[in-house]
């Protein structure tokens, strides 16, 4: 009987996490890395997503100083390995991140960043320097019936929409998309859960805007951040607002205030 109960609980545990499985880049649907199917495929698959181990999070011991926070925990003990593939998308396009069935109770923000590869993304790490510029975020919005962004994801067919800046210069970029789960965090600085993924894209168009200096990952997410990471999420409200980590959002009109 105990064994049966244990097996019945397995799907619940597995479904408690997730990852981006497909991405609409404008009108182009692109398959992302599947950590459960792609490693065994022959010949090896070459996708735009930097490979990660599984559907679990980057947690306390890794996100502050390890390059696991850059693009997730890698396969075979190596994090943030560039891939050779990219996918083209026009500046200003709508991007739709299609997550696996995100039904878990992980209240927190959803954030999206860009990093300019300064050439080929296959030759760019992103683990050092202030290269990550946030282009979109949603945290806690008390005007919505479901205030936390990540808890709205299941109500949107596990799909999250972000529009690329329309004035950005063409070139190769890393598009980094992330959920932060605050369900187990506390003011002592324990148990934050990050779910990042990195996708190599080639932005096309005639824009001239260059990304400004942004944040470093690792580096910007800190153990002493009691406003964004280590807090009691139940205390957040209309009168006690929440600010996601990673700084302000940048777009066609510069930095948002």
Briefly describe each language-model feature range.
Residues 93, 171-172:
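Surface-exposed loop/turn positions
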Residues 173-177:
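A short tyrosine-centered beta-strand micro-motif
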């Amino acid at each position: 009987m105990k064994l049966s109960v244990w097996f019945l609980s397995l799907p619940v545990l597995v479904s408690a996490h997730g990852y981006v499985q497909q991405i609409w880049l404008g009108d182009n649907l692109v398959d992302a890395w599947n950590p459960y199917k792609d490693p065994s495929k022959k010949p090896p698959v070459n996708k735009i997503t930097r490979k990660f181990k599984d559907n679990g999070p980057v947690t306390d011991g890794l996100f502050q100083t390890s390059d696991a926070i850059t693009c997730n925990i890698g396969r075979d003990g190596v994090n943030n390995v560039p891939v050779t593939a990219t996918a083209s998308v026009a500046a200003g396009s709508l991007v739709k991140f299609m997550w696996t069935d995100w039904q878990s109770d992980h209240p927190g923000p959803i954030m999206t960043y860009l990093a300019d590869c300064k050439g080929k993304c296959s030759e760019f790490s992103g683990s050092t320097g202030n290269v990550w510029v946030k282009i979109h975020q949603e945290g806690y919005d008390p005007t919505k019936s479901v205030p936390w962004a990540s808890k709205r994801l299941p109500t949107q067919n596990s799909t999250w929409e972000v529009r690329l800046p329309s004035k950005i210069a063409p070139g190769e970029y890393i598009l980094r998309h992330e959920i932060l789960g605050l369900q187990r965090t506390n003011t002592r600085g324990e148990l934050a859960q990050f779910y990042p993924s990195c996708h190599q894209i080639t932005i096309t168009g005639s824009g001239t805007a260059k990304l400004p200096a942004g944040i470093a990952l690792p580096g910007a997410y800190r153990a002493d951040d009691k406003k964004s990471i280590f807090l009691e999420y139940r205390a957040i409200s209309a009168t006690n607002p929440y600010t996601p980590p990673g700084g302000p959002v940048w777009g066609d009109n510069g930095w948002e205030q």
